[in-house]
Amino acid sequence: MNALRLGSYTFSSRLILGTGKFSSVSAMIEAVRASGSQLVTVALRRFNREQAEDDLFGPLSEIEGLTLMPNTSGAATAKEAVKAAHISRELSGSPFIKVEIHPNPHHLMPDPIETYEACKILAAEEFIVMPYIPADPVLAKRLEEVGCSSVMPLGSAIGSGQGLSTSAMVQLIIRESSIPVIVDAGLRSPSEACAAMEMGCEAVLVNSAIAVARDPAAMAGAFARAVEAGYDARNAGLMQRSGSAVATSPLTSFLGAGS
């Protein structure tokens, strides 16, 4: 695969991992290693060096070639997200920030207005801004215009496992974007990650589907292979769909050709 470029960084893996929901830190670390991911997202509250059982920064920092992308999960307003981003950059040293603002705990849908306001500020402060957004082509374009390095439309609701229910809108975003489009949230299976790559996404972010699997490390490896397969298939050139059968062999008579 060609390298994924985000800001001034390049990554050979196009699978981004979330680090929540795992049964233990060791299970999460095993999954990250098995995935080959070079970019993982971590909630601010998991930067806790004083309590080793809650701290992910230390263990993740030991993985060579891994870049941390703090996120603002828990923020309900642009102001809270900007504050979380500042603290995260100070603690991690990472220029990346995944902007997540979902004030309603019942559906966890991203707030488009607060997200836009936070991204304007953070992009001006030279963060590598990667916002989690509804699958809204107009919002995606506005975020590109203010300097976001990518947009991350949801495939479906966080943790729902409902797959690519927004695929039609995601395809519109891809068509109109000149920055990477990364599907985030709702993916349940490697086949759905493959489909996202085939439709034109530059990467996918997966958390729950790996974290709650019976064998998270094995599932992480399966997602990694699916992402690579989808990317390669897209670049190889997928055949066009047809409304009717198209013969693969000549239909002319041949049985009586020698008589």
Curated annotation (Swiss-Prot):
The gene is thiG. The keyword Cytoplasm applies. The lineage of its organism: Bacteria, Pseudomonadati, Chlorobiota, Chlorobiia, Chlorobiales. This is Thiazole synthase. It is found in: Cytoplasm. CDD domains: ThiG. Its EC number is 2.8.1.10. It comes from Chlorobaculum parvum (strain DSM 263 / NCIMB 8327) (Chlorobium vibrioforme subsp. thiosulfatophilum). Pathway: Cofactor biosynthesis; thiamine diphosphate biosynthesis. InterPro entries: Aldolase_TIM, Thiazole_synthase_ThiG, ThiG. Pfam families: ThiG. Catalyzes the rearrangement of 1-deoxy-D-xylulose 5-phosphate (DXP) to produce the thiazole phosphate moiety of thiamine. Sulfur is provided by the thiocarboxylate moiety of the carrier protein ThiS. In vitro, sulfur can be provided by H(2)S. GO terms for biological process: thiamine diphosphate biosynthetic process. GO terms for cellular component: cytoplasm. 1-deoxy-D-xylulose 5-phosphate binds at residues 159, 185-186, 207-208. It catalyses: [ThiS sulfur-carrier protein]-C-terminal-Gly-aminoethanethioate + 2-iminoacetate + 1-deoxy-D-xylulose 5-phosphate = [ThiS sulfur-carrier protein]-C-terminal Gly-Gly + 2-[(2R,5Z)-2-carboxy-4-methylthiazol-5(2H)-ylidene]ethyl phosphate + 2 H2O + H(+). GO terms for molecular function: thiazole synthase activity. Keywords: Cytoplasm, Schiff base, Thiamine biosynthesis, Transferase. Homotetramer. Forms heterodimers with either ThiH or ThiS. It is an enzyme of class 2 (transferase). Belongs to the ThiG family.
